[in-house]
Amino acid sequence: MKIKTRFAPSPTGYLHVGGARTALYSWLFARNHGGEFVLRIEDTDLERSTPEAIEAIMDGMNWLSLEWDEGPYFQTKRFDRYNAVIDEMLEAGTAYKCYCSKERLEALREEQMAKGEKPRYDGRCRHGHEHHSDDEPCVVRFANPQDGSVIFDDQIRGSIEFSNQELDDLIIRRTDGSPTYNFCVVVDDWDMEITHVIRGEDHINNTPRQINILKALNAPVPVYAHVSMINGDDGKKLSKRHGAVSVMQYRDDGYLPEALLNYLVRLGWSSGDQEIFTREEMIKLFSLNAVSKSASAFNTDKLLWLNHHYINSLAPEYVATHLQWHIEQENIDTRNGPQLAELVKLLGERCKTLKEMAQSCRYFYEDFAEFDADAAKKHLRPVARQPLEVVRDKLAAITEWSAENVHHAIQATADELEVGMGKVGMPLRVAVTGAGQSPALDVTVHAIGKSRSIERINKALAFIAERENQQ
């Protein structure tokens, strides 16, 4: 049997972390078994579904490289198929037309609640004793079995049982002729030959209803696995303040897709004590029986730690392809300066996100208008004039421009003036970067370039001279 899974989001908003984890688990399960992964857009909610949300979902899936083998399928393009199946069910007697008014149903609901009963349809139209004209408005209900129970073996939670007496005669077609969500899902899973349905635990109550419809259609019932919810690190329902933002927001904030995937796979799944997983390792090791049925806690600090790891462990050339987008957002012209892969090597240890890296690299490519006030006040003082003049001349004398030779020039300046390296290094750092912090000074000066470094030292010397004149 070929394994076939699906990810079926509703395009009423962005692809959030919970949906992305569900998609990842479904994708990994299919890949682990050499199966297929289907993308289906469940857009039957016409009022809330938007083209922008569809685009956001596709962008998120593509950024995470969760490629699909079939689709995307759209439920709104399959209404003829759904209605054809409903008509067959009406003919077979497994569905019936219901003419009950909203007023009657509301009165029935209030009466049942007053008695402490669970609100449910009472089956008045099920046996068709009343005569109605063909043009009279009606819904179509599924004739749910009235006795027995539905039992399914959830691959994460074990055996789950629902009494059929607890289940309503579900509406499967509205008065306007549109099919309902629970019915569309059933026909889709049947037609698309889905073997395993991996989804959030909020769908557990839908499962017995869907199984009963599948059985009424003599269709195969897929295997179900319901993933637990994700909480914030305070144990409360995940919200934006915990990090429940769109997948693409993580891209915008400077995270690598590898970091987010690694983090999401560990939100409920484990393989021993291993924390870092390549995509290939995830595919090889993933199994549903290792998914926890307990809620997971979202921890942004852990995600940030993973991102820093991947910035420094992946090939700099690859990281640079993702950094490029952030560089463009900052409007930095990188034609005159180090290659982005070199920049990743320079700033990787200091920066935990690519956004931070892009925001802290401008001095490598563009001259700055002024020095950081605090750094200049502390380090660009008259006492720094001689160290800057000497190191400038030694840098100018370098014939083979390299980080090693830059280091020798700085060291030689300190030795000649009989001062510590900091007395040379700190003024030089502020002079060439405009600020008091940077990567190692020798590689920084080397990356900025010989002529630009000397120009900036001269600018710093002019700043010191002007400062002296003002005193």
UniProtKB/Swiss-Prot annotation:
It catalyses: tRNA(Glu) + L-glutamate + ATP = L-glutamyl-tRNA(Glu) + AMP + diphosphate. It is found in: Cytoplasm. GO terms for molecular function: ATP binding; glutamate-tRNA ligase activity; tRNA binding; zinc ion binding. Keywords: Aminoacyl-tRNA synthetase, ATP-binding, Cytoplasm, Ligase, Metal-binding, Nucleotide-binding, Protein biosynthesis, Zinc. This is Glutamate--tRNA ligase. It holds the Pfam family tRNA-synt_1c. GO terms for cellular component: cytosol. Catalyzes the attachment of glutamate to tRNA(Glu) in a two-step reaction: glutamate is first activated by ATP to form Glu-AMP and then transferred to the acceptor end of tRNA(Glu).
